[in-house]
């Protein structure tokens, strides 16, 4: 079982060109399945002995643990995919996971902020950030500042420029968090204002960015250089410190590529500082990007290309969100509603 999983993960990495995020999730899900099959002190079961009843017991176990249906569905999808690969490679004659029904998930339309709400939020971004007091130091060394205030205050102020650029690119380009954190200097054409983005399945696409994102990027650029210098200085002073990653566009306080979780925390942080009743996360900005384009008359095929969707049906969910908003306006405004 473990050998089959190792081969499958390598297949995802080298043949399917799956994203690192997908590989980590699938590997974690399959290892959890192995742990269920092998309680402490028990031998590894033979691969051929695993049938649909065992897999159904595993999904029941996950339900007992309190996992959401979406999480159970993802883990079952990983198991199905593993056995499908094993059948193709001649390691099994059947795929027992196909006999286990997927949990029924509610169809949720994306909740989208209005263009006016997002524009107001982004235009007031600096003021929103200035009203906050840093909770902790994000850097141990003060970045360049003519007045030389306290390190925590200085770092918080200059990193606002990075955060502003980060928001502008998430919304202005419709990027996934993984796509934003994966951006390198070689993907950026500042003069033509275009990005080369690597999406799911390592599919590449070209996405333009507007004047607001360009202005935010230019404001962030000297901060980015300071972060690289501070990171290099930190590495010289401290042992076992990883070097900066100057090839990345968006950096953390140590000059290394910012992570997806950090992006999520920043989005939550600034939505909280704005005192708005939003359940905002990075994908909310991607939803808003698509819905606002569609509402202003953009072609659905063009939106599909900008989002990097493989199938048009994936993009069409935004038409449902737009229709829902129209119905809400109708119900509120029409005298005969």
Which residues does each PLM region occupy?
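Conserved catalytic core of the tyrosine transesterase superfamily
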Residues: 1-337
């Amino acid at each position: 079982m473990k050998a089959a999983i190792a081969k499958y993960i390598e297949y995802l990495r080298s043949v399917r060109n799956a994203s690192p995020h997908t590989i980590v999730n699938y590997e974690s899900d399959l290892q959890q399945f192995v742990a269920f099959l092998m309680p402490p002190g028990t031998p590894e079961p033979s691969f051929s002995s695993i049938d649909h009843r065992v897999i159904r017991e595993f999904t029941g176990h996950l339900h007992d643990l309190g996992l959401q249906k979406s999480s159970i569905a993802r883990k079952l999808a990983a198991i199905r995919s593993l056995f499908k690969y094993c059948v193709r490679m001649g390691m099994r004659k059947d795929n027992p996971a196909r006999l286990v029904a997927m949990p029924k998930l509610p169809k949720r339309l994306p909740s989208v902020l209005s263009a006016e709400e997002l524009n107001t939020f982004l235009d007031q971004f600096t003021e929103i950030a200035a009203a906050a007091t840093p909770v902790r130091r994000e850097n141990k060394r003060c970045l360049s500042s003519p007045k030389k205030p306290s390190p925590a205050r200085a770092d918080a102020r200059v990193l606002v420029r990075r955060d502003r650029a980060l928001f502008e690119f998430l919304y202005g380009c419709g990027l996934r968090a993984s796509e934003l954190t994966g951006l390198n200097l070689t993907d950026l054409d500042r003069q033509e204002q275009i990005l080369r983005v690597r999406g799911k399945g390592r599919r590449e696409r070209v996405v333009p960015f507007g004047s607001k994102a360009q202005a935010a990027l230019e404001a962030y650029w000297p901060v980015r250089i300071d972060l690289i210098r501070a990171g290099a200085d930190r590495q010289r002073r401290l042992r076992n410190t990883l070097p900066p990653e100057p090839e990345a566009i968006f950096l953390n306080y140590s000059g290394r590529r910012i992570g997806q979780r950090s992006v999520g925390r920043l989005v939550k942080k600034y939505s909280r500082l704005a005192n708005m009743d939003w359940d905002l996360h990075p994908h909310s900005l991607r939803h808003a990007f698509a819905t606002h384009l569609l509402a202003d008359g953009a072609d659905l095929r063009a939106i599909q290309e900008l989002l990097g969707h493989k199938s048009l049906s994936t993009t069409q969910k935004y038409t449902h969100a737009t229709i829902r908003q129209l119905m809400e306006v109708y119900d509120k405004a029409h005298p005969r509603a």
